[in-house]
């Protein structure tokens, strides 16, 4: 299993690792700060530097069948099993997604608290987030974005910690995605925005809501009866 450094610290930009296995263009390391994507969030990109000092681009990161994290590399350099590497993530890309990710938790929490609305689908890229909600009224989503921006200004420190599954399941509304079953893993990573939201979540987040900046509504689409899709980004 690959040690996932981002689970404890989303702000690791560079790390040292060792090549455990190579499968074609994919490299498995003993540890990584690259997020493999998941939960609607895009994967990280960046590069590895081998022992010769060659810079090798990482163009895709994904989770393998055995829980290992696979780093897809280009052919501008060579790697060998047991070779030490230095990994660097594309921080600008990652940090924008962190801001959008935390913003999406605030929006989802407000939707659930005010209207009992659940997310029925979503995706976060560096450019924007899109979420599907089971709500009837477009104005509801505009209201949520405005209220989320007021919460962001409150300068709230996030808490990230780990709980046994049985203990985590006792937290009300720990899963806010419609149709999503609680994960079967024994230890859950909990992301809490005190007074606002608490969720089981495996992705990178900012430390403080003020880092989000401002949520900017891009558009709202009808996606069938009682379902709306909202697109938004963050600035600056």
UniProtKB/Swiss-Prot annotation:
Xref: SMART domains: tRNA_SAD (SM00863)
Top-level taxonomic group: Archaea
Coiled-coil intervals, chain numbering: none
Residue positions binding Zn(2+): 101, 105, 205
GO biological-process terms attached to the record: alanyl-tRNA aminoacylation
Cofactor binding remark: Binds 1 zinc ion per subunit.
GO molecular function: alanine-tRNA ligase activity; aminoacyl-tRNA deacylase activity; ATP binding; metal ion binding; nucleic acid binding
The protein's role, per its UniProt record: Functions in trans to edit the amino acid moiety from incorrectly charged Ser-tRNA(Ala).
Protein name as annotated: Alanyl-tRNA editing protein AlaX-M
Species lineage: Archaea, Thermoproteota, Thermoprotei, Sulfolobales, Sulfolobaceae
UniProt gene name: alaXM
């Amino acid at each position: 299993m690959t040690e996932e450094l981002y689970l404890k610290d989303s702000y690791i930009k560079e790390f040292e690792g060792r090549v455990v296995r190579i499968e074609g263009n994919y490299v498995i390391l003993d540890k990584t700060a690259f997020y493999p994507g998941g939960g609607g969030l895009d994967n990280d990109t960046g590069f590895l530097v081998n022992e010769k000092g060659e810079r090798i681009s990482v163009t895709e990161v994904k989770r393998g069948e055995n829980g290992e994290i696979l780093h897809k590399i280009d052919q501008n350099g060579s790697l060998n099993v047991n070779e030490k590497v230095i990994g660097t993530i594309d921080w600008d890309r990652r940090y924008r997604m962190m801001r959008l990710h935390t913003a999406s938790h605030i929006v989802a929490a407000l939707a659930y608290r005010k209207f009992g609305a659940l997310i029925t689908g979503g995706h976060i890229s560096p450019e924007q987030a899109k979420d599907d909600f089971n709500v009837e009224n477009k104005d509801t989503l505009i209201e949520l974005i405005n209220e989320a921006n007021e919460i962001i200004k409150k300068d709230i420190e996030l808490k990230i910690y780990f709980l046994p599954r049985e203990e985590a399941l006792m937290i009300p509304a720990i899963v806010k995605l419609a149709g999503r079953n609680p994960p079967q893993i024994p230890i859950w990573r909990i992301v809490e925005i005190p007074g606002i939201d608490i969720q089981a979540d495996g992705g990178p987040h900012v430390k403080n809501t003020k880092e989000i900046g401002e949520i900017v509504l891009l558009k709202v689409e009808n996606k069938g009866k009682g379902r709306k899709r909202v697109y938004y980004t963050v600035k600056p």
